[in-house]
Amino acid sequence: MMTTEEEVLSPDDRDFVTALASGLEVVLAFDEAHPRMTLSEVAARTDMNRARARRFLLTLHALGYVRKQGRYFELAPRVLQLGYAFLSANNYRSVIQQVLEDITAESGESSSLGVLDGDAVTYVARSSAPHRLMAITLSVGTRLPAAHTSMGRALLAQLPDAELDAFLERVTLERYTDKTVTDKALLKKCILKVRQQGYAIADQELDSGLRSLAVPAFDANGKLLGAINISTNAARVDLDTLMREYLPLLQRKAREIRETVS
């Protein structure tokens, strides 16, 4: 049975391959905070028993996606092929990468392209300014909660009402700072405002001091490519500057993408 683009298999469906899902879960257990782990740590991170986690780790090791050093496991460079397959299949990235670099050159701030990936926004292109904005390193592949980021809200605003309501129903809103929106009714109001005005601001909701602005990016046919943003330090860039200087810049660059990418 083939599914439509909108249909998603449930884990209970007979076509759902649990072993594949679990193997990917093991790969995704490794991140910046957990680059090397023991078998017990992987089992705990994935909520698997040790025997099951061991089978997946050894299979990934045999396929070249995981390296084993004594008691520790870590991802091997071969996993980059998985991400590169996505990047190479989306040839518009080279155009957008140049746009992001132009934004950084004009503003002196970091700029990124993100796409909605489940309940998160995933960075697929980035131009970094010299100054660091968050405790974690933002790079291609970074995933952040869509509910609390400017790119996430810019993308959520593009969803049909039913899909937005489904997102709000299932998402868990964690508090990261004293400015984090944790009320779902208020979050929906914020997203609907973004839909109306065409841009999104996230002001220190995910990390104290991080202020960002995002707009959606479309190709010449009106297909949503993602959202582009500018990330700033709240102590350096106030909201007035964000709106007066950076919003027109982002809007101009979004038009440039639409005129260039077909």
What do these predicted ranges mean?
Residues 74-171:
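Amphipathic alpha-helical effector-binding/dimerization core
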Residues 2-94, 101, 255, 259-260:
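N-terminal helix-turn-helix
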Residues 16-20, 76, 89, 93, ...:
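Short, structured helix-loop boundary elements
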Residues 217-220:
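Sensor-regulatory modules in signal-transduction proteins
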Residues 95-103, 168-214, 260:
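Short, basic/aromatic recognition patches
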Residues 126-128, 205, 229:
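Short clusters of small/polar residues that mark proteolytic maturation junctions
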